[in-house]
Amino acid sequence: KLMFGEHHFSHAASAFYASPFEEAVVLTLDGVGEWATTTVSIGKGHELNIVKEIHFPHSLGLLYSAFTYYTGFRVNSGEYKVMGLAPYGEPKYKELILDKLIDLKEDGSFRLDQSYFNYATGLTMVNQKFADLFDEPVRKADTDKLTQFHMDIAASIQAVTEEVVLTMTRS
């Protein structure tokens, strides 16, 4: 019998059922599945249940992809480059990102301020308001060099990502 599972449930199931644990909390975070972008599931024995979801357009994965685009890399394939740049920078813009772009709650839930992004309605990830926030234009990969600014932006979004995941884990 062929069965189709939801995107995030499939991620959670492949992590939980292949694990050595009888009980676990399973977090899944990525760009977007059907509509969910983030889930919290509880696994116990043979049962796995999603207990919390965050839906599109509020997505930690798409936030990271927005910074991938902003730093001049290709979305859905260049995120590892942003992660690789992060150790060379300082998270100078972490608080600005937390103040303006992502509203992170104590329970780990979050909402993105969509006025800075185009991914839900346009052909680009970010808009001019996003670039103005950091006083730098979107980097053109073929002509613009990577600078310390891009390394600091990478360190900043990496630090924000880590804070979001740790906040979710602790709640």
Task: List where the protein language model places each region.
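Short acidic/glycine-rich loops and adjacent helix/strand connectors
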Residues: 1-171
